UniProtKB/Swiss-Prot annotation:
Tissue: Muscle (at protein level).
Lineage: Eukaryota, Metazoa, Spiralia, Lophotrochozoa, Mollusca
GO terms (BP aspect): phosphocreatine biosynthetic process
Protein name: Arginine kinase Oct f 2
Family note: Belongs to the ATP:guanido phosphotransferase family.
pH dependence: Stable below pH 9.0. Degrades by incubation at pH 9.5 and 10.0 for 1 hour.
Assigned keywords, A-Z: Allergen, ATP-binding, Kinase, Nucleotide-binding, Transferase
Substrates-to-products reaction catalysed: L-arginine + ATP = N(omega)-phospho-L-arginine + ADP + H(+)
Every Phosphagen kinase N-terminal domain range: 1-83
Record carries keyword Zinc: no
Domain of life: Eukaryota
Length: 348
């Protein structure tokens, strides 16, 4: 299987993925027969990237142990993607939540439509989608939901499994853009949708400012969000949820990598802090992308990666996930968004 996949990759002349760049014949021969303690193989890691030659990264981790067993290729991809000289990540640090110096980025309410911060988390005792069986997913859902149901205060809420979700709830959550689906072909090829929709679901707080996706791409995606630009409130809520969940669950992490995720692009802080912001003038300027790059920001359409902007509204987020702390990541995003607002205001 691995041999066939590697041959397909080598023959894909239009493929420019990081997998193709870094999985040399020498590395392939060295790694192809190895197995992780979860039973993961090199074939499990590279299947999606070989079947989808237009992949950007092209490699997933079959499980937390893959980052050790297949380090020779994964480390090379990680350094290239995260633009770092060596695989290194600091100890997690969310800052002093009582003294963050992060507030409302848009007090006027004229530009920022909404603010969202999310992290991914993986159970350390379960593999990632390529090695998971149906029973694993069900068990993981059970322990995740048990922890979620212990949340209190503004984080208290309800869990809705996808497997027996009513049409009304499904319609409402889709309209709210809260629901995830099984339409990503890269994830599909990586076994991300095996046994769909069993073992998957969504938890949200009563006022829907805190959500958790269970067994979407990662085991857990913790999401804090609200209308307007108060990044401080959104971030503080997320940190509170993370701290409470960490008391109940053991998450996969590695000293030099931070928190482990299915895709190596999300490693480290796993944090994506974003705003939906109206920038009709700045977005038309030829230097828009270079301004984003200067402040380590990523701009994309409001419906996710590879989508277009609607009415000059863009999703602006931090680009760097690895090699910096959570607090550094969110403050870097804050400084960048402040500059974006300044540039938009000064554009004619």
């Amino acid at each position: 299987m691995a041999e066939e996949l590697f041959k397909t990759l080598q023959n894909a002349k239009e493929c420019h993925s990081l997998l193709k760049k870094h999985l040399t014949k020498e590395r392939f021969d060295k790694l192809k027969g190895l197995k992780t303690k979860f039973g993961g193989t090199l074939a499990d890691c590279i299947r999606s990237g070989c079947k989808n030659p237009d992949s950007g990264v092209g490699i997933y981790a079959s499980d937390p142990d893959a980052y050790t067993v297949f380090a020779e290729v994964l480390d090379a991809v990680i350094m290239d993607y995260h633009k770092i000289d060596k695989v290194h990540h600091p100890i997690p640090d969310f800052g002093d939540v009582n003294n963050l110096n992060i507030g409302d980025l848009d007090p006027s309410g004229n530009m920022i439509v909404s603010t969202r911060v999310r992290v991914g988390r993986s159970h350390d005792s379960f593999g990632f989608p390529p090695v998971l069986k149906k029973d694993d997913r069900i068990k993981m859902e059970q322990v995740s939901v048990e922890a979620l149901k212990s949340l209190d205060g503004e984080l208290a809420g309800s869990y809705f499994p996808l497997a027996n979700m009513s049409a009304d709830v499904q319609k409402q959550l889709t309209e709210d853009h809260f629901l995830f689906n099984d339409s990503d072909r890269f994830l599909k090829a990586a076994s991300g949708y095996d046994d769909w929709p069993i073992g998957r679901g969504i938890y949200f707080s009563e006022n829907k400012t805190f959500l958790c996706w269970v067994n979407e791409e990662d085991h857990l995606r913790l999401i804090s969000m609200q209308k307007g630009g108060n990044l401080g409130e959104v971030y503080k809520r997320l940190v509170s949820a993370i701290n409470k969940m960490e008391k109940k669950l053991n998450f996969a992490k590695k000293d030099n990598m931070g928190y482990l995720t299915f895709c190596p692009s999300n490693l480290g802080t796993t944090m994506r802090a974003s705003v939906h912001i109206k920038i009709p003038k700045l977005s038309q300027r030829s230097d828009f992308k270079s301004i984003c790059d200067k402040y380590n920001l990523q701009a994309r359409g409001i419906h996710g990666e590879h989508t277009e902007s609607v009415c000059g509204v863009y999703d602006i987020s931090n680009k760097r996930r690895m090699g910096l702390t959570e607090y550094e990541a969110v403050t870097e995003m804050m400084r960048g968004v402040n500059e974006i607002i300044r540039e938009e205001t000064n554009s004619t």
